[in-house]
UniProtKB/Swiss-Prot annotation:
Its EC number is 3.5.1.103. Belongs to the MshB deacetylase family. The keyword ATP-binding does not apply. It catalyses: 1D-myo-inositol 2-acetamido-2-deoxy-alpha-D-glucopyranoside + H2O = 1D-myo-inositol 2-amino-2-deoxy-alpha-D-glucopyranoside + acetate. The keyword tRNA-binding does not apply. InterPro entries: GlcNAc_PI_deacetylase-related, LmbE-like_dom_sf, Mycothiol_biosynthesis_MshB. It is an enzyme of class 3 (hydrolase). It comes from Frankia alni (strain DSM 45986 / CECT 9034 / ACN14a). This is 1D-myo-inositol 2-acetamido-2-deoxy-alpha-D-glucopyranoside deacetylase 1.
Length: 289
């Protein structure tokens, strides 16, 4: 479950494309908001912003549809329906106080919205952010809280019986940035020609990218065959990021390397057998199909 359009591809794009290509695996993307409070990189679309026409959310639905097509994901849902909860903006922004914002969402109501999907789809695995929302965005934090709550609520026969038959999800993963992977990627960027031609104001700071110690990472999904699909999906979110080869920059000016290998921490459930790396190499490791 992701907070805004574009989050899915940055953190989990290669993983989603990898599993979407497997006809025996169903990938369902749930997005919590339309990303209405985002900035806009394209000058001719600048008036779509929330402080102008406030039409960015609708435009980003189209970007998300194109990104899903690039990843091969055919089942996408907005939590509670498109527009049910609004992008809260960055932490401490005035928009955090908007009663429509996801940050202000009633946890029980939001959990029930996700439980309805879980009980319909009956997944073995769920994926979301860690408790600080990867980098402290209020919607990412709320997405974590709602997913953890729904993981438990979906299996509780007394919770929202109108939302379907109870279902116990086997594993819950949190996305992660491996510290070693971040350092290697930043080093690669500084050594590349892109570092010499990066636009003014673009930074590539490893210290600014919140990461986790390698020892905490439980699962590493290597999907080099789907790197091109991930990059294509990134390009679909053209109001939010620029992409040049393996390098991308968000509207805040921070540059990162797109990753074909994505890392996770198992938060709930039993780990499967490790690969040669000592980490799981499959989110479904140890599970019976």
């Amino acid at each position: 479950m992701h907070a805004h359009p574009d989050d899915e591809v940055i953190a989990t794009g290669a993983t989603m494309a990898h599993y979407a290509a497997d006809r025996d695996t169903r990938v369902v993307l749930v997005t919590c908001t339309l990303g209405e409070m985002g900035e806009v990189l394209i000058p001719e679309l600048i008036n779509l912003r929330a402080d102008h026409a406030d039409q960015l959310g609708g435009y980003r639905i189209g970007e998300l549809e194109r990104a899903c097509a690039a990843l091969g994901v055919t089942d996408h849902r907005f939590l509670g329906g498109a527009g049910r909860w609004r992008d809260s903006g960055m932490m401490s922004s005035p928009s955090n106080a908007d009663p429509r914002s996801f940050w202000r969402a009633d946890l029980t109501a939001a959990s029930e919205a996700l439980v309805r999907i879980v009980r319909e789809v009956r997944p073995q695995v769920m994926v979301t952010y860690d408790a600080i929302g990867d980098y402290g965005h209020p919607d990412h934090i709320r997405a974590h809280d709602v997913t953890v709550r729904a993981f438990d609520d979906a299996a509780d026969p007394d919770f929202a019986p109108q939302a379907g038959e109870p279902w116990q999800v086997s594993k819950l993963y949190e996305t992660a940035l491996s510290r070693a992977a971040v350092d290697a990627a930043v080093d690669q960027l500084w050594r590349s020609d892109l570092a010499k031609t990066a636009p003014e104001g673009i930074s590539m700071p490893s210290d600014m990218l919140l990461s986790v110690p390698d020892a905490k990472v439980t699962t590493r999904i290597e999907a080099p065959d789907f790197f091109a699909a991930k990059v294509e999906a990134m390009r679909a979110h053209r109001t939010q990021m620029t992409v040049d080869g393996f390098f991308f920059a968000l509207v805040n000016g921070d540059g990162q390397a797109a990753r074909a290998t994505e890392h996770y921490v198992l938060a709930r459930g039993t780990p499967g057998p490790p690969a040669a790396s000592g980490k799981e190499d499959d989110l479904f490791a140890g599970l019976v199909p």
